Amino acid sequence: GATYDVAMRFLHEDPWVRLDLLREAMPNQNIQMLLRGRNTVGYTPYPDSVCRGFVQEAAKSGVDVFRIFDALNDVSQMRPAIDAVLETNTTVAEVAMAYSGDLASPKENLYTLDYYLKLAEQIVESGAHILAIKDMAGLLRPEAASKLVMALRKEFDLPVHVHTHDTAGG
Protein backbone atom coordinates (compact mmCIF):
# COMPACT_ATOMS: atom_id res chain seq x y z
CA GLY A 1 0.00 0.00 0.00
CA ALA A 2 2.72 2.50 0.91
CA THR A 3 5.13 1.45 -1.85
CA TYR A 4 4.38 4.45 -4.04
CA ASP A 5 4.58 6.89 -1.13
CA VAL A 6 7.88 5.41 0.08
CA ALA A 7 9.39 5.43 -3.42
CA MET A 8 8.59 9.10 -3.92
CA ARG A 9 8.98 10.53 -0.41
CA PHE A 10 11.97 8.61 0.95
CA LEU A 11 13.76 7.05 -2.02
CA HIS A 12 13.12 9.98 -4.39
CA GLU A 13 12.27 7.50 -7.14
CA ASP A 14 9.51 7.39 -9.71
CA PRO A 15 7.37 4.40 -8.65
CA TRP A 16 6.36 3.75 -12.27
CA VAL A 17 9.99 3.55 -13.38
CA ARG A 18 10.69 1.28 -10.40
CA LEU A 19 7.85 -1.03 -11.48
CA ASP A 20 9.13 -1.08 -15.08
CA LEU A 21 12.61 -2.04 -13.83
CA LEU A 22 11.19 -4.80 -11.64
CA ARG A 23 9.16 -6.20 -14.55
CA GLU A 24 12.22 -6.09 -16.79
CA ALA A 25 14.35 -7.87 -14.16
CA MET A 26 11.67 -10.51 -13.48
CA PRO A 27 9.84 -11.10 -16.76
CA ASN A 28 8.37 -14.47 -15.79
CA GLN A 29 7.31 -13.73 -12.20
CA ASN A 30 3.91 -12.60 -11.04
CA ILE A 31 4.07 -9.15 -9.51
CA GLN A 32 1.50 -8.42 -6.82
CA MET A 33 0.57 -5.13 -5.23
CA LEU A 34 -1.67 -4.04 -2.41
CA LEU A 35 -4.55 -1.66 -3.10
CA ARG A 36 -6.40 0.09 -0.31
CA GLY A 37 -9.69 -0.22 -2.19
CA ARG A 38 -10.98 3.17 -3.35
CA ASN A 39 -7.87 4.81 -1.81
CA THR A 40 -5.60 2.85 -4.22
CA VAL A 41 -2.13 3.61 -2.80
CA GLY A 42 -3.08 6.94 -1.25
CA TYR A 43 -4.57 8.10 2.00
CA THR A 44 -7.88 9.47 0.79
CA PRO A 45 -10.76 8.00 -1.25
CA TYR A 46 -10.52 8.75 -4.96
CA PRO A 47 -13.22 8.90 -7.64
CA ASP A 48 -13.88 5.68 -9.56
CA SER A 49 -12.20 7.14 -12.66
CA VAL A 50 -8.93 7.71 -10.77
CA CYS A 51 -9.04 4.21 -9.30
CA ARG A 52 -9.72 2.73 -12.74
CA GLY A 53 -6.93 4.75 -14.36
CA PHE A 54 -4.45 3.74 -11.68
CA VAL A 55 -5.26 0.04 -12.04
CA GLN A 56 -5.04 0.23 -15.85
CA GLU A 57 -1.61 1.89 -15.66
CA ALA A 58 -0.35 -0.55 -13.02
CA ALA A 59 -1.54 -3.51 -15.10
CA LYS A 60 0.12 -2.07 -18.21
CA SER A 61 3.32 -1.63 -16.21
CA GLY A 62 3.35 -5.28 -15.17
CA VAL A 63 1.27 -5.82 -12.04
CA ASP A 64 -0.44 -9.21 -12.32
CA VAL A 65 -2.23 -9.61 -8.97
CA PHE A 66 -3.96 -6.89 -6.98
CA ARG A 67 -4.64 -7.64 -3.31
CA ILE A 68 -7.54 -5.34 -2.52
CA PHE A 69 -8.69 -4.55 1.00
CA ASP A 70 -10.49 -1.99 3.11
CA ALA A 71 -9.40 -1.63 6.74
CA LEU A 72 -13.06 -1.52 7.82
CA ASN A 73 -14.09 -4.43 5.55
CA ASP A 74 -16.45 -2.18 3.62
CA VAL A 75 -16.91 -3.98 0.31
CA SER A 76 -18.51 -0.89 -1.24
CA GLN A 77 -15.17 0.91 -0.72
CA MET A 78 -13.32 -1.99 -2.38
CA ARG A 79 -15.74 -2.22 -5.30
CA PRO A 80 -14.16 0.44 -7.57
CA ALA A 81 -10.78 -1.30 -7.33
CA ILE A 82 -12.29 -4.77 -7.80
CA ASP A 83 -14.26 -3.62 -10.84
CA ALA A 84 -11.19 -1.91 -12.31
CA VAL A 85 -9.12 -5.08 -11.94
CA LEU A 86 -11.85 -7.21 -13.49
CA GLU A 87 -12.12 -4.77 -16.42
CA THR A 88 -8.48 -5.39 -17.38
CA ASN A 89 -9.32 -9.02 -18.26
CA THR A 90 -5.64 -9.84 -17.66
CA THR A 91 -5.08 -9.34 -13.93
CA VAL A 92 -6.19 -11.12 -10.78
CA ALA A 93 -8.38 -9.64 -8.04
CA GLU A 94 -7.32 -11.11 -4.70
CA VAL A 95 -9.83 -9.53 -2.34
CA ALA A 96 -8.92 -9.55 1.33
CA MET A 97 -10.84 -9.52 4.58
CA ALA A 98 -9.06 -7.54 7.29
CA TYR A 99 -8.93 -9.93 10.24
CA SER A 100 -9.58 -8.65 13.74
CA GLY A 101 -10.66 -10.10 17.06
CA ASP A 102 -10.46 -13.80 17.89
CA LEU A 103 -13.22 -15.81 16.28
CA ALA A 104 -12.14 -18.90 18.26
CA SER A 105 -12.91 -17.16 21.56
CA PRO A 106 -16.33 -17.80 23.08
CA LYS A 107 -16.22 -14.18 24.31
CA GLU A 108 -15.99 -12.78 20.76
CA ASN A 109 -19.34 -11.32 19.74
CA LEU A 110 -18.47 -9.07 16.78
CA TYR A 111 -15.75 -10.69 14.65
CA THR A 112 -17.29 -14.15 14.62
CA LEU A 113 -17.09 -16.91 12.05
CA ASP A 114 -20.53 -15.83 10.84
CA TYR A 115 -19.25 -12.25 10.39
CA TYR A 116 -16.39 -13.45 8.17
CA LEU A 117 -18.58 -15.84 6.18
CA LYS A 118 -21.07 -13.05 5.41
CA LEU A 119 -18.20 -10.76 4.43
CA ALA A 120 -16.70 -13.48 2.24
CA GLU A 121 -20.05 -13.92 0.51
CA GLN A 122 -20.04 -10.22 -0.44
CA ILE A 123 -16.46 -10.53 -1.68
CA VAL A 124 -17.24 -13.59 -3.78
CA GLU A 125 -20.33 -11.86 -5.22
CA SER A 126 -18.13 -8.90 -6.17
CA GLY A 127 -16.27 -11.12 -8.64
CA ALA A 128 -13.05 -11.80 -6.71
CA HIS A 129 -10.74 -14.42 -8.20
CA ILE A 130 -9.08 -15.19 -4.85
CA LEU A 131 -10.40 -14.79 -1.32
CA ALA A 132 -7.78 -13.61 1.16
CA ILE A 133 -7.48 -13.19 4.90
CA LYS A 134 -5.31 -10.18 5.73
CA ASP A 135 -4.07 -10.41 9.29
CA MET A 136 -2.12 -7.17 9.42
CA ALA A 137 -2.04 -6.99 13.23
CA GLY A 138 -0.88 -10.57 13.80
CA LEU A 139 -4.05 -11.53 15.69
CA LEU A 140 -4.91 -14.69 13.75
CA ARG A 141 -4.17 -17.62 16.04
CA PRO A 142 -3.81 -21.17 14.71
CA GLU A 143 -7.19 -22.39 16.04
CA ALA A 144 -9.02 -19.41 14.53
CA ALA A 145 -7.09 -19.72 11.26
CA SER A 146 -8.03 -23.38 10.98
CA LYS A 147 -11.73 -22.72 11.63
CA LEU A 148 -11.87 -19.78 9.25
CA VAL A 149 -9.94 -21.32 6.36
CA MET A 150 -11.85 -24.61 6.60
CA ALA A 151 -15.20 -22.79 6.64
CA LEU A 152 -14.25 -20.58 3.69
CA ARG A 153 -13.05 -23.56 1.65
CA LYS A 154 -16.22 -25.49 2.45
CA GLU A 155 -18.52 -22.58 1.60
CA PHE A 156 -16.84 -21.03 -1.45
CA ASP A 157 -15.19 -22.37 -4.59
CA LEU A 158 -12.27 -19.93 -4.63
CA PRO A 159 -8.64 -20.23 -3.61
CA VAL A 160 -8.07 -18.95 -0.07
CA HIS A 161 -4.86 -17.07 0.72
CA VAL A 162 -3.68 -16.10 4.20
CA HIS A 163 -1.37 -13.14 4.81
CA THR A 164 -0.32 -12.82 8.43
CA HIS A 165 2.22 -11.08 10.64
CA ASP A 166 3.84 -12.14 13.90
CA THR A 167 4.73 -8.72 15.22
CA ALA A 168 4.49 -9.82 18.85
CA GLY A 169 6.97 -12.64 18.26
CA GLY A 170 4.66 -15.26 19.71
Feature locations, PLM:
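Alpha/beta enzyme core
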Residues: 1-4, 11-31, 36, 40-162, ...
